[in-house]
């Protein structure tokens, strides 16, 4: 039986081309992307992933066409990548947008496109649980990257990608320096609404079980 070809999931700036955006968005919007202007807005210290703002030029002029979108992919820094994989942060975020965005009771950007490879190392979960129990986080990050490189027939790291709405008037606080008191009040207000919605909710337990089941 012929092997199924893996989907194309770009991970680097040079791969986010107009043709790729058209492939992802043309069916949704009935228009093609002609050009892309990329801006890195999050990478390096304090970031588990890399975040790009992509300004799109379309072959049509309509109010419903997004003028920019946000792309999120895993970090290229081994320690950050290892931590993200070890805690399943990339997979959880993709699944949350795909399956739970309407049920979270949190303001979330609109999802335009999401993709990730199948898990090539499902056995690794138990190993990572053991490492997190007995090793410091930095050691777990390094060990996770090494396991991922050695696991399976394909040494390439698992790919993840999110394309979401660009909230152009949003101001994300620094993940290193932290935010202001006003930022904390806004964040805690949103968390309070989330907590109130899901507290002692049997439906919410089902949502949690669904996500955990997809991660196993």
What are the language-model segments listed below?
Residues 41-216:
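Conserved ATP-binding subdomain of kinase catalytic cores across diverse folds
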Residues 1-40:
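Juxta-kinase regulatory segment immediately upstream of eukaryotic protein kinase catalytic domains
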